[in-house]
């Protein structure tokens, strides 16, 4: 979800598009102005021949955004009219750039040809109209879509109920037909939006300008798109839904609240507004119950890097680490599941059963994945066909999907399947076999991109088409065959069939054979005289005239037959949209289960126990992303750790672990890995551990890492406090909370006080399962006061004044953070490190406040800065060379530690 505004550099004042009737311009430009006035918020792609042209301020904006030449066409009020253009055949590439920068584009096509325009008058302008609005949430073109990412359009509905408001969201992926709706609340709204991760959010203008919701839309930036409130009218929603889905009443769709109807109405109305006359094959809106998915707030999603890292890249994310799917639909389903883990243990168990099946049946898993690799993106192909943007390859995608589905049916023919896989196979068996056979029979092997190119129907499928192709491609052979036939019929060995631009095709015989051609009434009827020459006579026949017409029209007729067949196949496919979509969803579910099974086997993951208890017991847990990164870099194995937050004895609530330990010891990794294990388990995946027992988590909160929010005037500490406040105000006993270094962004005693109070509140009020990492070692005394609080620490070893990080979690509390040692590893000057040791020693001897003055007097800062360090003796040339090779600015903590060991070894020689 790109939340930034279009980055338009400062530019000189532009020539804005005038209002209709206010400018003395050409008829063509007047037409542009009128159409632009109806689409003021979009760049207007105005079709002129083989180009889409843009004028006035649209041209200046597009020129900067696309990096194309700005030129001019005509004048307005004495000034040149700016113009730029893009070729029609490359329009998708330019649309991708514009949409990516936050623009919306109105595509204006010619809706009549020039000949028709001339019939209306010599000066008539060809009729044009907008056929489509291209927006971030309504893209269907393959070039503009990432195969593994959904492209959701979301609509926000709000209705008033007394003094309160109720909210709902509806989200559609036009490219696949997916359509869901759910109620939400004002405090959950932003979290639900981030869960769906829409490309575009439409909202009624009064709601968009509501001061109470302003913070939400400020966060979303250009993703939010205000629309007229009439689109969201819940009173007329029922009729709009019925018309769109062509049903008498939508009662069979289920019962929806007024807010849900408002959101559904807004989504459908916007689809109609942007797609004009075309209608995408949307599924019926599926209602999602509140609480059916794990609540994860936006900050936690960002901290855990589920789909993307904090820098916006998929590399390094959890999704990238676990994705082993082989289909676009499977990858999208896996991403959707990661963003919305389940809270129903039975539903989670059904998913895990499917993964377990493939984990056990490895040969079946391999065979199924081999078949799935040939599955193209059926839902997206179907959507393009329905919107009249498809081509032969989209029909080919459906054919490939049907063929793979048939192979998978054969693979599972005599196999008992778990519930989820059995339901998936039922949907696959229900795929329309008549359409499948029709596509297999009709389509050739090599398919063109565009239907207008022809050549996509298989030979033998349509007899007339075969004849037309023969005439088109083998006209000489056909003429030669007719010539031989006429020679045999007349006995004139010198008879020839020739062609010129005046007569077309004709039969030519020498003059002395004219009697054969004209000597009888039958011959006269058969051979029609066309021309007499000095030594020859020319004739035609009805057969030759028909053949000539056929040859002349063969190419057009061949293409016409193929286009008609394309439309018929498309109509048949769109008519089966519901079954095709269900079958494609089933193939995606099978892909996800098989992929997770492969992942669990290759990574040695275990099946978690997920139930309704409050358990949280992980043995040998690992961080899935970090573990793979260590393996790739060859830095050694990941150190697994246990975590047990389960209620103890007669306790009704889960435990809190107070985690202390040094910087670089692995605290943040440990925190994140347990949150990720919970997410993976409730997604229905095996988890990176030797065993795991997790009582369903209903809310997950993570406050790990922070950054400034300068745009809203919030410091790092303020951001930290806002996020911590949200956790303390919302977490219940089923929540899992991971907190890292609360209170570090302010004065020591202030920070300690806040962290101390937060732990007490989590224990006494929230009563949730939690891991709280801190450098405030004074807090470890809370373990004697709070019954469910336990001290754990990241273990280290000290050796000859240096520290070795073991990355192991054990019982107990740390009394030091080893910050000075880490500073040395980072390459701080030796004088700074030595002075830090002195300051630390004196601070640790007594109260800080009683020592600071003496510290300043003992060794002023400038004394350290000006002191020249005596060079230290180097024990060997090897040690000096090794030191010279080290660049501490480019080393990871682990690399620094390994370098330290090497230097120690050299120093001892």
From Swiss-Prot:
Transmembrane regions: none
Chain intervals for the UniProt region annotation (Disordered): 275-295
A biological process term (GO) from this entry: mismatch repair
Annotated GO MF terms: ATP binding; ATP-dependent DNA damage sensor activity; damaged DNA binding; mismatched DNA binding
Matching CDD domains: ABC_MutS1 (cd03284)
Keywords: ATP-binding, DNA damage, DNA repair, DNA-binding, Nucleotide-binding
Binding site for ATP: 661-668
Biased composition (Basic and acidic residues): 275-290
This protein's record includes keyword Methyltransferase: no
SMART domains (alphabetical): MUTSac, MUTSd
GO cellular component terms given for this protein: cytosol
Similarity remark: Belongs to the DNA mismatch repair MutS family.
Role according to the record: This protein is involved in the repair of mismatches in DNA. It is possible that it carries out the mismatch recognition step. This protein has a weak ATPase activity.
HAMAP family noted in UniProt: MutS (MF_00096)
UniProt name for this protein: DNA mismatch repair protein MutS
Gene that encodes the chain: mutS
């Amino acid at each position: 979800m790109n939340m930034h505004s279009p980055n338009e550099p400062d530019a000189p004042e532009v020539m804005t598009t005038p209002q209709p009737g206010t400018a003395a311009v050409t008829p063509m430009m007047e037409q542009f102005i009128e159409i632009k006035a109806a689409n003021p918020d979009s760049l207007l792609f105005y079709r002129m021949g083989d180009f889409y042209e843009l004028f006035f301020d649209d041209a200046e904006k597009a020129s900067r955004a696309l990096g194309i030449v700005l030129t001019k066409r005509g004048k307005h009020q004495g000034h040149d009219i700016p113009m730029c253009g893009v070729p029609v055949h490359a329009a998708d590439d330019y649309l991708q750039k514009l949409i990516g920068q936050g623009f919306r584009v109105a595509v204006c096509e010619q809706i009549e040809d020039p000949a028709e325009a001339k019939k209306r008058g010599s000066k008539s302008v060809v009729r044009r109209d907008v056929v489509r609005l291209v927006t971030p949430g309504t893209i269907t073109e393959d070039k503009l879509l990432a195969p593994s990412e959904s492209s959701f359009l979301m609509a926000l509905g709000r209705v008033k109920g007394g003094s309160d408001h109720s909210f709902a969201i509806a989200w559609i992926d036009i490219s696949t037909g997916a359509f869901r709706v759910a109620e939400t609340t004002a405090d959950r709204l932003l979290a639900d939006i981030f869960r769906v991760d829409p490309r575009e959010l439409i909202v009624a203008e009064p709601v968009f300008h509501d001061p109470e919701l302003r913070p939400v839309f400020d966060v979303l930036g250009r993703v939010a798109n205000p629309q007229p409130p009439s689109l969201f009218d819940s009173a007329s929603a029922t009729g709009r839904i019925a018309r769109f889905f062509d049903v008498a009443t939508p009662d069979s769709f289920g019962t929806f609240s007024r807010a849900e109807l408002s959101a559904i109405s807004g989504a459908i109305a916007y689809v109609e507004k942007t797609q004009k006359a075309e209608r995408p094959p949307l599924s019926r809106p599926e209602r999602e119950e509140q609480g059916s998915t794990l609540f994860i707030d936006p900050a936690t999603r960002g901290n855990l890097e589920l789909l993307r890292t904090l820098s916006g890249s998929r590399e390094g994310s959890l999704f990238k680490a676990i994705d082993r799917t082989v289909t676009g639909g499977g990858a999208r389903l896996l991403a959707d599941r990661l963003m919305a883990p389940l809270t129903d243990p039975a539903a989670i168990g059904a998913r895990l059963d499917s993964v377990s099946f493939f984990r056990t049946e490895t040969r079946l898993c391999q065979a199924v994945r081999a078949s799935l690799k040939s599955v193209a993106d059926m839902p997206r192909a179907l959507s393009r066909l329905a919107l009249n943007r498809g081509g032969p390859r989209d029909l080919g995608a459906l054919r490939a999907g049907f063929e793979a589905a048939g192979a998978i049916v054969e693979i599972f023919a005599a196999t008992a399947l778990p519930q989820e896989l059995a339901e998936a196979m039922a949907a696959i068996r229900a795929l329309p076999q008549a359409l499948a056979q029709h596509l297999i029979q009709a389509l050739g092997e090599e398919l063109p991109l565009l239907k207008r190119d022809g050549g996509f129907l298989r030979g033998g499928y349509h007899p007339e088409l075969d004849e037309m192709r023969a005439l088109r491609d083998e006209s000489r052979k056909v003429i030669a065959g007719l010539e031989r036939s006429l020679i045999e019929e007349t006995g004139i060995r010198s008879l020839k069939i020739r062609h010129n631009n005046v007569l077309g095709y004709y039969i030519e015989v020498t003059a002395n054979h004219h009697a054969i051609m004209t000597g009888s009434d039958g011959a006269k009827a058969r051979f029609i005289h066309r021309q007499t020459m000095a030594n020859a006579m020319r004739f035609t026949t009805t057969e030759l005239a028909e053949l000539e017409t056929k040859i002349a029209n063969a190419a057009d007729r061949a293409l016409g037959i193929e286009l008609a067949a394309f439309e018929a196949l498309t109509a048949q496919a769109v008519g089966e949209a519901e079954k095709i979509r269900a079958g494609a969803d089933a193939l995606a579910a099978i892909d996800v289960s098989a992929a997770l099974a492969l992942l669990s086997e290759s990574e040695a993951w275990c099946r978690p126990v997920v139930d309704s208890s409050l358990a949280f017991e992980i043995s040998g847990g690992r961080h899935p992303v970090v573990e793979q990164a260590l393996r790739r870099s060859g830095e050694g194995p990941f150190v697994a750790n246990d975590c047990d937050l389960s209620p103890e004895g007669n306790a009704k609530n889960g435990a809190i672990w107070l985690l202390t330990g040094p910087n670089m010891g692995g605290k943040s990794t440990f925190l994140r890995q347990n949150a990720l294990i919970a997410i993976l388990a409730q997604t229905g995946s095996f988890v990176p551990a030797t065993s795991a027992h997790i009582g369903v988590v209903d809310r997950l909160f993570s406050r790990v890492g922070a950054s400034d929010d300068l745009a809203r005037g919030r410091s790092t500490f303020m951001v930290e406090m806002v996020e911590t406040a949200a956790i303390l105000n919302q977490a219940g006993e089923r929540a899992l909370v991971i907190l890292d270094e609360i209170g570090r962004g302010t004065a020591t005693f202030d920070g300690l006080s806040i962290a101390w109070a937060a732990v007490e509140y989590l224990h006494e009020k929230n009563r949730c399962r939690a891991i709280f990492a801190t450098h405030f070692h004074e807090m470890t005394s809370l373990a004697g006061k709070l019954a469910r609080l336990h001290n754990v620490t990241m273990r280290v070893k000290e050796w000859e004044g240096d520290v070795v990080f073991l990355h192991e979690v054990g019982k107990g509390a740390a009394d030091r953070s080893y910050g000075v040692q880490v500073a040395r590893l980072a390459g701080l000057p030796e004088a700074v490190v030595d002075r830090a040791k002195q300051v630390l020693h004196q601070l640790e001897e007594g109260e800080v406040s009683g020592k600071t003055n003496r510290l300043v007097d003992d060794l002023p800062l400038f004394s350290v800065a000006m002191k020249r360090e005596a060079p230290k003796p180097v024990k060997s040339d090897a040690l000096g060379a090794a030191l010279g090779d080290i660049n501490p600015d480019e080393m990871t903590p682990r690399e620094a530690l390994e370098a330290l060991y090497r230097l120690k070894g050299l120093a001892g020689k």
